């Protein structure tokens, strides 16, 4: 957790549920702009290991730790997983300690630490972001995190992000938590989803001739629902799965008088989805390239959740 300038015995307070939140409520009202918003409580090393394993951190990753404390997450990512990265913290003593720890670990060529507000930190280059922040800070950060490149991995110790449900979460024993008193730790993991809400259109060859398709999608974080229109017939999406930029779904609709199952899998690239389409039915068995284009975006998709806009009648396939 990021440090606060006020020195308080947080370890005792944090042993009980709500202790961290209670301390934050004391600190925030009197804090000047730019002062730290969360207290410093180190993440136990065994939790650090599980966080990095859950995010599958590797040599190609660039990790940013928000509220980096003594630097242990960034240093472990570099030393054990070959990653690069940096940590941010407001307390100059923590920055000094982090640099000393990085030097001792022999990873100063791959890590750095910066004294600055985490809300002023450029996160755009990160492939992995780690954090041990309080719930209200996570919620305040959430819109910025959703702006990151699809596929960016986020790992939080103990606190979630409200109604943005984690892709993975679990509870583990942490014997070194609370200054050695021990306790349980929660780990939450998300993959930043691509934005797919809107109306998508494409054509696919069916029975030797191109057939128009239209897809209307609604999105709440990584959860996607919607309907497909195929040659004037409609079907509800099934098995929709969005993980980062990887998007897949299926539906069954009548084509040429017989039901045909459609299975799509592709990668979202802005206003395009590029992948493959597989069709299977009594009269049709085919697989082809799939290239969908977004015809209509929602009025605003910055906040998520978002609903698909309706097409004008001139844009709808008949």
Which stretches of residues belong to each language-model region?
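S-adenosyl-L-methionine
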Residues: 25-61, 92-125
